Amino acid sequence: MATIIEMPELVLEKVIAFLDFKAVLTLRQVCHDFRNFIDDLNDSKLPDSKFQEIKFVSDDRRISFGLEESKKRFTCISYSKGQRSFCGKTEFFGYSNILNVAVRDMEMILKFQKTILERLQFEFHNVQLYGGSLVHTVPIKLSNMLQKLNRNVKTRTLSIKTNDPSPIMQILRFVDPGALKTIELSSLDGKMEIEIDEFAKTEQWKKADGIHCGFNVLNLNLEDICHFSSCSITLNSITAQELDFLRKTPQKTSDFSFFCVVLSLLHGLKNDFWTVDRYGKC
């Protein structure tokens, strides 16, 4: 009798079609032949992991990501001090491999994800990674992985928290603009300022319904936010003419729901909240 690895590829494909995401990942770890076979399979022949939310975090202690299947089912994978912890099991490896292992696992998860995510969140803390490598290499590795994936990630909401503006474009450009509804950008220390004009040129920005920026926005053309039905931004200053322009904008948008402008003062202090409803009333 032939062993499972000696079965014809068509038979193996049918076997995998009956398995769930975790079972295929387990099968992938059995031997190199299984791993290579699964890695070479067309994405359409892999089971859907059906996650609702994926959260990737890198800080001074670990790299981790959370996988939410439902409100009652949540899995956390953590990589720290040369080890990986998943469902109570720990695997040890060299310090230099922490980032590589984490990004490779993230690639596998996204490869299996066919259902549109409700939320994809990245959190990049400005700290040193094990081995002396700066953490800004994390979004670069992720960007390279997303490019290798050869398809855009489908999510309703993209959330990026960082103290460095560079990861935003590195991630944003690989999100499917047809699925994306809301962009959430935040500063971890509350001190970051970002020139937003380059982001506004992307299809993701142009097709999204909502934008929420938790940092000072520079070089903003107000016409670039007129299409949003929901918007929250922080500006250093705003003119009376610009305020009047924003006040009239909701009347031109049928599905407008919320607009908020926060004016910032020196030393990072916040001042003067300005909001408007769909009828242009402040």
Protein language model annotation of sequence segments:
Residues 1-282:
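Non-core capping and flanking segments associated with repeat-based/extracellular domains
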